[in-house]
């Protein structure tokens, strides 16, 4: 399954970009990043179907890493070919995008800078795929 991160803003050569790259290199699933301008630009349609869309949103569900992995594993096993992860700019997502998403998730109750959220998402995607592969990286409790 392709993991497609669609993010507002250019990450450039920042410390966050180094973290994203570090985790992206470890992910054995397909990986793609599309950067959009902070304002304007349209979210591209899925490259593959069937697909799922996950919007990173402060109002979203707070999942454990194992719960997140289970969702991705279920989608993969159901034949989903692409999961798109949408990260908004400073003002987040509009209501239409939230409503069209298959899942809204949040990394806790705090609000995170979108560049840091991208690095956190990359780590959680690595963790989820490692859980599904039976890799010892993740430890519960």
UniProtKB/Swiss-Prot annotation:
Its EC number is 2.1.1.177. Disulfide bonds: none annotated. One of its GO terms (cellular component) is cytoplasm. It is an enzyme of class 2 (transferase). It catalyses: pseudouridine(1915) in 23S rRNA + S-adenosyl-L-methionine = N(3)-methylpseudouridine(1915) in 23S rRNA + S-adenosyl-L-homocysteine + H(+). The keyword Nuclease does not apply. Homodimer. This is Ribosomal RNA large subunit methyltransferase H. It comes from Novosphingobium aromaticivorans (strain ATCC 700278 / DSM 12444 / CCUG 56034 / CIP 105152 / NBRC 16084 / F199).
């Amino acid at each position: 399954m392709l993991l497609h991160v669609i993010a507002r803003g250019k990450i450039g050569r920042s410390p966050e970009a180094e973290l994203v790259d570090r985790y992206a290199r470890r992910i054995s699933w397909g990986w793609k990043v599309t950067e959009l301008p902070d304002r304007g630009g349209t979210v591209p349609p899925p490259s593959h179907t069937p697909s799922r869309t996950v919007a990173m949103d402060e109002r979203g569900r707070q999942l454990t890493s194992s719960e997140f992995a289970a969702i991705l594993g279920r989608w993969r096993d159901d034949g989903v070919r692409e999961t798109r992860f949408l990260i908004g700019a400073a003002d987040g997502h509009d209501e239409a995008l939230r409503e069209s998403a298959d899942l809204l998730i949040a990394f806790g109750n705090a609000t995170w800078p979108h560049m840091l959220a991208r690095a956190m998402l990359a780590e959680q995607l690595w963790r989820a795929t490692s859980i599904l592969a039976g890799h010892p990286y993740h430890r519960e409790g």
